[in-house]
């Protein structure tokens, strides 16, 4: 793939159809508060990610739709609609998961409110261009995480099956639509300096800080003191050289600010094809 051509050609460069699916996960097997290997830290970390999805994804949709009228490429316009459909359904499914997590003892209401207030403030204070740049940034992090979720079975196998499949379905769709916000930005804004600045702020500051604070807040509800083994599992989960969620894909997180970058420079369409078959029993088209 010629990355320079992609950067110069400001229309849809998607590699996969962005499918509209309906899914159903019972979540009957999510029965423990510390559902991931009995580990409170990994479990709270994913609970806080899940709480962040519904407000976050609502903002992704809004910020892309702000530019809908300026999109000249009919393929990209159609993709925006399918992207919005997918993100809305992710939110719906994560709300069901969050409800389940609340039943298991996580009190997520306060965190949800903080997210919503922060986004409402930004809606008033930030320019549409900056909001779209943040969405493009978050979509790259999400798509990179999605690549990890589909390629790291050893780590993923410890989630309860239905929750693992929910996360992997979400991952498939994040990869399918990973270039939509980017292509909209390229066509309608095109300011790479702004984009790189917003991305660096998101990657090194906003995202890790927000996740650390929300994970800590959830753990504090139990007056939790981590054991050495808890710490080891959590550290391995994030930073194992071979398949850590952060460390193993660090070059892909960083690739974003390189000249000529496009989300499909990492072609993971094969991963999606492999997983679609496994998860198809959950899909009701
Ligand atoms: Fe999503
Ligand atoms: Fe997304």
Model-based region annotation:
Residues 2-285:
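Non-heme di-metal
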């Amino acid at each position: 793939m010629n990355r320079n051509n992609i950067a110069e050609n400001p229309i849809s460069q998607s590699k996969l159809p962005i499918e509209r699916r309906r899914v159903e996960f019972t979540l009957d097997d999510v029965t423990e508060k510390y559902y991931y290997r009995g580990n409170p830290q990994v479990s709270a970390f994913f609970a806080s990610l899940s709480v962040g999805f519904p407000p976050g994804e609502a903002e992704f949709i809004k910020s892309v739709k702000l530019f809908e009228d300026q999109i000249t490429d009919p393929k990209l316009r159609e993709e925006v609609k399918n992207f919005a459909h997918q993100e809305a359904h992710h939110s719906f499914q994560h709300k069901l998961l969050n409800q389940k997590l609340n039943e298991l003892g996580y009190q997520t209401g306060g965190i949800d409110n903080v997210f919503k207030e922060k986004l409402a403030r930004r809606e008033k204070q930030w320019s549409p261009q900056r909001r779209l740049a943040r969405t493009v940034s978050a979509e790259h992090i999400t798509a990179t995480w999605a690549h990890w979720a589909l390629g790291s079975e050893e780590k993923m196998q410890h989630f309860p099956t239905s929750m693992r499949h929910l996360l992997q379905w979400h991952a498939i769709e994040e990869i399918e639509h990973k270039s939509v916000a980017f292509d909209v930005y390229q066509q309608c804004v095109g300011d790479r300096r702004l984009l790189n600045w917003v991305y660096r702020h998101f990657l090194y500051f906003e995202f890790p800080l927000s996740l650390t604070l929300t994970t800590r807040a959830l753990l504090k509800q139990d007056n939790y003191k981590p054991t050495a083994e808890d710490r080891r599992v959590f550290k391995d989960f994030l930073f194992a050289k071979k398949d850590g969620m952060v460390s193993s894909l660090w070059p892909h997180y960083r690739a974003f600010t390189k000249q000529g970058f496009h989300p499909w420079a990492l072609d993971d369409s094969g991963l999606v094809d492999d997983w679609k078959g496994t998860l198809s029993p959950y899909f009701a088209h």
